[in-house]
Amino acid sequence: LRCVDNCFATPALQRPVTLGADIVMHSGTKFLDGQGRVMAGALCAPEAMVRDKFLPVQKNAGMVLSPFNAWVVLKGLETLNIRLKAQSAAALDIARWLEQHPAVSRVFYPGLPSHPQYALAMRQMSGVGGAVLSFDVKAADAAQARARAFHVLDSLQVLSLCTNLGDTK
């Protein structure tokens, strides 16, 4: 059984079922809504699996999205493609800039040709690297790396620390 968490790529960039996935998980809270307004998710699987395995749990546990929250996610889907395109372009610009920065040792972004899985990402993710990246700061040891990483976080002026991703805040 092949399960894929597609919350970073979303259906706008990657369709895991076409790549052989049996079950695909999507977070409606993150990119799909895009505004941080709901707690939602979707589990996509073959109809028989949903009927035989998931529906009994759903009936007993009550994990059903309210009509209003479903509507909110649907409204977010209307702008998903354009939001992800812009977010992915911005992430690529930032990744390129970080790759050249003297205080950065490594950038993790599948949209960069230097990424070891760049070709796979481009093939699977509609030719873009997505909207999320990470990087390592240059440091002599773990303590220095931690101190430098927190210095970067404390120096942010445009971005803020938050518990969600993919929304406009």
Walk through the language-model features, giving the residues of each.
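Conserved PLP-enzyme active-site core in the AAT-like
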Residues: L1-A103, F108
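Conserved C-terminal alpha-helix-loop-beta "cap" of PLP-dependent enzymes
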Residues: V104-K169
